[in-house]
From Swiss-Prot:
Protein name as it appears in the record: Iron-sulfur cluster assembly protein CyaY
Gene encoding the protein: cyaY
InterPro entries: CyaY, Frataxin/CyaY, Frataxin/CyaY_sf, Frataxin_CS
Organism this protein belongs to: Azotobacter vinelandii (strain DJ / ATCC BAA-1303)
SMART domains: Frataxin_Cyay
Top-level lineage group: Bacteria
Lineage of source species: Bacteria, Pseudomonadati, Pseudomonadota, Gammaproteobacteria, Pseudomonadales
UniProt GO cellular component terms: cytosol
MF annotations from Gene Ontology: ferric iron binding; ferrous iron binding
Role, per record: Involved in iron-sulfur (Fe-S) cluster assembly. May act as a regulator of Fe-S biogenesis.
Amino acid sequence: MSLTEARFHELIDDLQQNVEDVFEDSDLDVDLENSAGVLSVRFENGSQLILSRQEPLRQLWLAARSGGFHFDYDEAGGRWICDASGDSLGELLARVTLEQIGEELEFPEL
C-alpha cells in the first residue's frame, strides 16, 4: 500500500521534528533551518546534512558529505529505510554525523 500525500507529509514533518530535537538536545553547535520541506543541519566545521522530501516519489532524501541517500517508508517496521543499503534513517544519520563531525549521536525514533 502506498502512502497517501497527507500521510507522507505527516511522517516527514514528524521525522524532521525528531531530527531537530536530537540536535537541539545535544551539546553540538549547529544551525537548523526548516523551510519548504527541507531541513538543513549546518555544523560548526562548515559541513551540513540536508533532509528533503520528494513528494512525487514519496521518498525522503538525505544529502551528506559522503553522498546522497534515498529512503522509502516501511509501514510494517514504522521506519524510513535506505533503498540502497537497507539501513534505517537513524542508523545512517548516526554514521554520517560521526563521519562529518566526529561526534556520536543516537536517533532512536528513526
